[in-house]
């Protein structure tokens, strides 16, 4: 049986997130997932976050409570890839999260996209496996929270680009041929989580918001690292938090 026929909405899952974690009293309604250690360490240094729980999706990862502008957030790091990040989101929902915000990096498929831009995905090409266990098969999954997130960025006067993303499981098999096909379909970036987490969002009926940071580029015969100046990136990240 092909993986695209793996969705089973007729029977219950054998292992549920509540088998791994318990609901936490007064758990913040909004949870934030980040990938970069440097950004996470900055938050810890600036705001003195306290541990309120642990993620158990493969690794024991601390969850912290972040207090900012009289609001409380749960924040944790997640691993690269759709399966691990989907598992992390599942456990946060089981603990009590009502909304999830995910911030990560991506590779651009269009060299004309200026490095350092934030990107808001509007749809994700499902070149991974996790999403097919949560929703019916399709080439793309719509990011239903994209419109609201674009409005928020506009209100904050934060420049961004919106468009389709290519979600892949195979970091080292992003071939020139597949890159060109995704570009022809309108994809502007590639990453490894969007399709998976948006499938979780739809299945669990929990809004998940994602924005990305355009970093390296695949638009060419060879990979272009194209790293943005660290100080500029840090300033943009602080602006998002504020």
Question: Where do the language-model regions lie?
Answer:
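Short, hinge-like loop/turn segments at secondary-structure boundaries
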Residues: 118-121, 208-209, 227-229
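Active-site rim beta-loop-alpha module in soluble metabolic enzymes
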Residues: 139-184
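A C-terminal functional module that forms or caps the active site or interfaces directly
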Residues: 177-180, 185-209, 213-217
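Metabolite-binding pocket within alpha/beta catalytic cores that recognizes anionic/polar moieties
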Residues: 1-143, 147
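Short acidic/His/Gly/Ser-rich catalytic and metal-binding motifs that mark active-site loops
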Residues: 127-129, 173-175, 217-222
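His/Asp/Glu-rich mid-to-C-terminal helical/loop segments that flank catalytic regions of hydrolases
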Residues: 218-242
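Glycine-rich beta-alpha junction loops
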Residues: 36, 107, 166-171, 196, ...
């Amino acid at each position: 049986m092909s993986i695209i026929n793996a969705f089973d909405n007729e029977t219950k899952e054998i292992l549920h997130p509540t088998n791994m974690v318990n609901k936490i009293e007064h758990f913040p309604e909004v949870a934030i997932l980040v990938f970069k250690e440097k950004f996470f360490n900055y938050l810890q240094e600036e705001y003195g976050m306290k541990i309120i729980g642990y993620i158990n999706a493969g690794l024991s990862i601390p969850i912290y409570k972040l207090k900012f502008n009289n609001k409380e957030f749960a924040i944790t790091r997640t691993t690269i890839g759709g399966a691990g990040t989907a598992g992390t989101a599942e456990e946060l929902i089981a603990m009590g999260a009502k909304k999830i915000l995910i911030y990560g990096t991506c590779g651009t498929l269009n060299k004309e996209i200026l490095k350092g831009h934030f990107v808001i995905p509007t749809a994700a090409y499902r070149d991974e496996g996790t999403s097919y266990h949560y929703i019916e098969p399709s080439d793309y999954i719509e990011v239903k929270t994209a419109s609201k997130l674009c409005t928020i960025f506009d209100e904050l006067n934060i420049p961004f680009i919106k468009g389709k993303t290519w979600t892949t499981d195979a970091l080292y098999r992003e071939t020139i041929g597949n890159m060109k096909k995704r570009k022809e379909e309108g994809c502007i970036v590639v990453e490894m989580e969007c399709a998976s987490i948006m499938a979780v969002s739809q299945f669990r009926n929990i809004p998940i918001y994602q924005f990305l940071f355009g970093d390296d580029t695949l638009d060419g015969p060879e990979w272009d690292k194209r790293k943005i100046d660290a100080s500029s990136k840090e300033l943009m990240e602080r602006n998002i938090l504020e």
